[in-house]
């Protein structure tokens, strides 16, 4: 992505704490893509403590869609390992509240929904490697257009654990072939942001019948000279909640992540070694 494209992302070089303050004040906008480059962004799942052990094991058995970067104690809305001033109830742009597998509300503040038995799971997000791609001048159309990344349910089943089962969900970004190679190279180095893609070029092989109709996010055109590249996605737990129907849960809304203080390991060296390369 050229410098003028980076300039369209006003919080690209913001600190994670600054982004969280914006979220807390309701001033961040609904999507955290392109914010706080060099740091891990996280999908959030909050479940009753009675389900925490099973969901923890589910994450460990499904590390591509659910790369675990943090887990709270029951009832604790602080997660110091991910941010010193962090409040899990207010520091995301938008949350979803779930009852019996149905999404019943979206809100920017869950303090009135908070329960003392909730355990929070933070799962790495592809926005982290998107920022690395941006820094390495690899263009992404949804960012250029100010849209959400398109996200799809697949025919790939997660490894089930206890009550938790459901399909792997993927995000898609179209690239010309040389940029696709670089996207694979760079994302492979960030396993906590889903790592390498799981499919390139053939959406029908993973059960996506209409690439122009994503299940979440916004449609993104795939040009004739481009390949659709699919990564495992942290929206997977929301598809799992819909299938597994726990009595209560809270998640992030798609695109509305927790921006953590956890640095991407080796980020500066990664960018220095890949920026300006053709392949």
From Swiss-Prot:
Pfam families: D-Glu_cyclase (PF07286)
Alphabetical keyword list: Lyase
Domain of life: Bacteria
GO MF term set: lyase activity
Classification via InterPro entries: D-Glu_cyclase, Putative_hydro-lyase, UPF0317
Enzyme Commission number(s) from the entry: 4.2.1.-
SUPFAM superfamilies: PSTPO5379-like
Family membership: Belongs to the D-glutamate cyclase family.
Name of the protein described by the UniProt record: Putative hydro-lyase GDI0188/Gdia_2258
Phylogenetic classification of the source organism: Bacteria, Pseudomonadati, Pseudomonadota, Alphaproteobacteria, Acetobacterales
